[in-house]
């Protein structure tokens, strides 16, 4: 099972890429504490206020275009960026074997952005 979502941001693909890959930017909207090496094979650690911690490995990173993370629970998130009139469309596809945790974190993470 997967969750699929599209969001259009009034920013360039490069600006959106920074918000998706730079730890200090991710801490503004996604998780409380972030460590991320946004290159293929790079590691990521995401911590939330509720004490939840998730680890990820960057499978694919094409700056301004596509980011794929493999989560420590065998789930994944694929983010594809596309320049559109007025900004950047981000197409998000998340898959996870344990949807109870994934849905909770999905709600915590994406609600402030949408």
Residue ranges and their predicted role:
Residues 1-35:
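Hydrophobic ligand-binding cavity/cleft-lining segments
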Residues 8, 56-58, 106:
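Residue-level detection of beta-strand scaffold positions
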Residues 25-27, 66, 107-108:
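Short amphipathic alpha-helical segments with coiled-coil-like heptad repeat character
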Residues 34-98:
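Hydrophobic-ligand binding "helix-grip"
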Residues 95-114:
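A conserved amphipathic terminal alpha-helix motif
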């Amino acid at each position: 099972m997967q969750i699929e979502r599209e969001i259009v941001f009034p920013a360039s693909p490069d600006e959106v890429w920074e918000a998706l890959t730079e730890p200090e930017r991710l801490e503004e909207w996604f998780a409380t504490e972030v460590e991320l090496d946004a290159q293929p094979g790079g590691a990521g650690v995401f911590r939330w206020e509720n004490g939840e911690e998730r680890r990820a490995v960057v499978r694919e990173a094409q700056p301004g275009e596509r980011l794929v993370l493999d989560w420590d629970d065998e789930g994944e998130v694929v983010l594809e960026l596309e320049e559109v009139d007025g900004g950047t469309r981000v197409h998000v596809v998340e898959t996870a074997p344990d949807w109870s945790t994934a849905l909770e974190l999905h709600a915590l993470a994406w609600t402030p952005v949408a």
